[in-house]
Regions:
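ATP-dependent adenylation/nucleotidyltransferase module used to activate substrates
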Residues: 1-128, 134-135, 141-163, 174
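AMP-forming adenylation/ATP pyrophosphatase catalytic core
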Residues: 31, 113-120, 147-361
Length: 361
């Protein structure tokens, strides 16, 4: 239980279904950095308040060391090398659905539940229904080859962040709010008198809170100013405060003037240079083919064929031809896709079933 409305309602629904529920707050990050306050103490208090309201046990699992090593250090290293990682995906893979799951099971739990906007199914039943909440008994939930399904609320769907969890972990997981929209979740939380019903959603880095990525990285990576150049002429257009801050397709934060928007089309980490253009049709901004490595499949790997892909959270699903190769796979979307950058995840779907995905090479 994170202290937000989603996990609060998830716990309440499980209690109403007759589950023996224990609320667990994961203490993953408590460090206050200069000018940045981590909200963990407030979140902990909110989670505990809801647990008391529901009359359920409350525990704290301290994963700070593991989180720093598995998530934060990974994120920092990726940015150092000029890639664009997603720490929320790594947090789900290494902490929530691995370390937390293992700890909960060893502590006597049969399953875990989270407040993610996602659903679980196997083609026969699915957990979560827009008309009424249907949460299967444990015996039904521990199923072979469980499928990760998109949430009913497409705007809040979080399967993009969940694509690297295992089928085994998914079979021991419940997503009680996946069948509801966000407005429904807030209304239902309010009807149950949960103090988090109107709490704003977290917008910061996973578990770190309202901290901008630039401010956070500046605490761990030496900032080295460098040149911003026109990608075609090589003309120096301005200065930047660290090439690792910039990602392909980025438009804001350069203050180059001239009245035209500039887009990042490349960077050279060895030279600490960022390359930009005013041409939105620049070939470096668009991909007709996407190469993925470090593949992960929730169940079996799909066969070659046409699927749907999502290149970032809340991006629309687009059709693409998938071809499995020896060291990864290639995706060829129906139309070129803008701003595909090394290090980001591309997630593959078969309609509303999340199959898995990989990292852009």
């Amino acid at each position: 239980m994170s202290g937000g409305v989603d996990s609060s309602l998830a716990a309440a629904l499980l209690v109403e279904q007759g589950y023996d529920v224990t609320a667990v707050y994961m203490k993953n990050w408590t460090l206050d950095l200069p000018g940045m306050k981590c909200p963990w103490a407030d979140d902990l208090a909110d989670a505990k308040r809801v647990a008391v309201k529901l009359g359920i046990d409350f525990k704290v699992f301290d994963f700070q060391n593991e989180y720093k090593y598995k998530v934060v250090d990974y994120m920092i290293d990726e940015y150092k090398y000029g890639r664009t990682p997603n720490p929320d995906i790594m947090c789900n893979q290494e902490v929530k659905f691995k370390l937390f799951l293992e700890t909960a099971l060893s502590d006597g739990a049969d399953m875990i539940a989270t407040g993610h906007y996602a659903r679980v199914g196997n083609g026969v039943w699915e957990m979560g229904n827009r008309e009424e909440q249907k949460i299967p008994p444990i015996s039904q939930s521990l199923i072979p080859n469980p499928q990760l399904l998109m949430a009913i609320d497409e705007k809040k769907d979080q399967t993009y962040f969940l694509y690297r969890i295992t089928g085994e972990a998914l079979g021991k997981t419940l997503f009680p709010i996946g069948g509801f929209t966000k407005p429904q979740v807030r209304r239902m939380a309010s009807e149950r008198g949960l103090s988090t019903a109107t709490k704003k959603d977290s917008q910061g880095i996973c578990f770190i809170g309202q901290v901008g990525i630039r401010d956070f990285l500046s605490q761990y990576i030496d900032v080295k100013p460098g040149e911003i150049k026109d990608s075609k002429s090589g003309k120096v257009l301005g200065r930047h405060d660290g090439a690792f801050f910039y990602t392909l397709g980025q438009r804001h934060g350069m203050e180059l003037g001239g009245g035209l928007p500039y887009y990042v089309v490349g960077k050279d980490m060895s030279k600490n240079e960022v390359y930009v253009t005013t041409d939105l049709n620049d070939a470096n901004l668009w991909k007709n083919s996407i190469n993925l490595s470090d593949m992960h499949w929730i169940n079996d790997a799909p066969k070659n064929g046409e699927y749907q892909i999502r290149v970032r959270h809340q991006a629309p699903l687009v059709d693409a031809i998938l071809t499995i190769e020896e060291n990864g796979l290639t995706l060829k979307p129906d139309n070129p896709i803008r701003s595909i950058t090394p290090g980001q995840s591309v997630v593959i779907y078969d309609k509303d079933v999340c199959l898995g995905g990989g990292i852009v090479s």
